[in-house]
From Swiss-Prot:
Entry GO CC: cytoplasm
Organism: Methanococcus maripaludis (strain DSM 14266 / JCM 13030 / NBRC 101832 / S2 / LL)
Top-level class of the enzyme under EC nomenclature: hydrolase
Superkingdom of origin organism: Archaea
Location of the protein in the cell: Cytoplasm
Gene name of this polypeptide: mch
Name of this chain's protein: Methenyltetrahydromethanopterin cyclohydrolase
């Protein structure tokens, strides 16, 4: 059985050894846990964002960053590229932000390998039939505050490991690393919607790849939450190899997956969030999806695609001006 924590550990160790090059800080807590500050009190970097994203994906994906090859002159943004041969485990078993870490006054959304030890949430792991077994716990936290010993103790207890084997990576939404890792969820947005909204068995997805633009740092965490989500919803493009069973309606799956199927499509995410009174649970689940979905059905040989990118909404979200 693949271990997302053990697969991610060498990447964590690489980040620690390259901390100056990556513009990150490594902090050893008094209880022995290790914190990697990737953007709270440091600048971070694209390379740190790439490695952070690989860890979010449980070490089971290739991650790259480049400038888009498009020459349409509409908008030039860096892009993050993802590909994985283990889509269900990498995206839902690791990358999904499925752990609300709340300890005292500290709160962060947790994603990454440690979730597969703590089974956060249990239903997801039952759906994909996966659980990790490892003596090390690696958790990625989206927060503008660094965790303390109490948070590390909490994670260690939930994961059943010694606190000295806990690694906590932290990046605010409003940071370079934060922007990269959120755009790096482009494939996961699709598998999440497959499972949570369309109730499709994601274990049938055998390979997945995606690309999404990376938001520039344009403001505080709230503004960046809107911008980073828009990168995927209006700029994300994905490709899934699916081995269907007879009776699976893959054409309907493909049509239902992209963000354009949501009622709120066409508005910047921050506007939708405000209209929902800042309550994620009031937002149409269908909105959390890539802009374009392409599926190759390995059983039938059919290739199909649905959706479209929307540069105008991205420009509006970023308050972009062409000089």
């Amino acid at each position: 059985m693949l271990s997302v924590n053990l697969a991610s550990l060498p990447i964590v160790e690489e980040m620690i050894s390259r901390k100056e090059d990556l513009n990150i800080e490594v902090i050893k807590l008094e209880n022995g846990a290790t914190v990697l500050d990737c953007g709270v009190n440091v600048m971070g970097s694209f390379e740190a964002g790439k490695l952070f994203t690989k860890i979010c994906l449980g070490g089971l994906a290739h991650v790259g960053i480049s400038i888009s090859g498009s020459l349409d002159n509409k908008l030039v943004l860096p892009c993050v590229k993802i590909k994985t041969s283990h889509p269900a485990i990498a995206t839902l078993g690791s990358q999904k932000a499925g752990w609300s870490v709340s300890v005292g006054k500290y709160f962060a959304m947790g994603s990454g390998p440690a979730r597969a030890l703590a089974m956060m949430p249990k239903a997801t792991y039952e759906e994909i039939d996966y659980r990790d077994e490892a003596d090390v716990a690696i958790l990625c936290l989206e927060s503008s505050q660094l965790p303390d010993e109490n948070v590390a103790d909490h994670v260690a207890e939930k994961c059943g490991v010694d606190v000295s084997k806990v690694y906590l990576l932290v990046a605010p939404t409003a940071s370079m690393v934060g922007a990269v890792q959120i755009s790096g969820r482009v494939v996961e947005n699709g598998t999440y919607k497959m499972l949570e909204a369309l109730h499709f068995d994601v274990r049938k997805v055998k390979f997945a790849a995606g690309i999404a633009p990376v938001a520039p740092v344009i403001g505080d965490d709230l503004k960046m939450m809107g911008a980073t989500n828009d990168m995927v919803l209006y700029g994300g493009r994905t490709f899934y190899y699916v081995k269907s069973d007879e009776g699976d309606d893959i054409e309907n799956l493909c049509k239902s997956l992209p963000s354009c199927s949501a009622e709120t499509y066409g508005k910047p995410f921050l506007d939708v969030f405000k209209e929902a009174n800042y309550d994620f649970y009031k937002i149409d689940k269908g909105m959390f999806a890539p802009a374009i979905v392409t599926i190759n059905d390995l059983r039938t040989g059919k290739l199909m695609s649905y959706g479209e990118t929307n540069v105008d909404v991205i420009k509006k979200s970023l308050k972009f001006s062409q000089l």
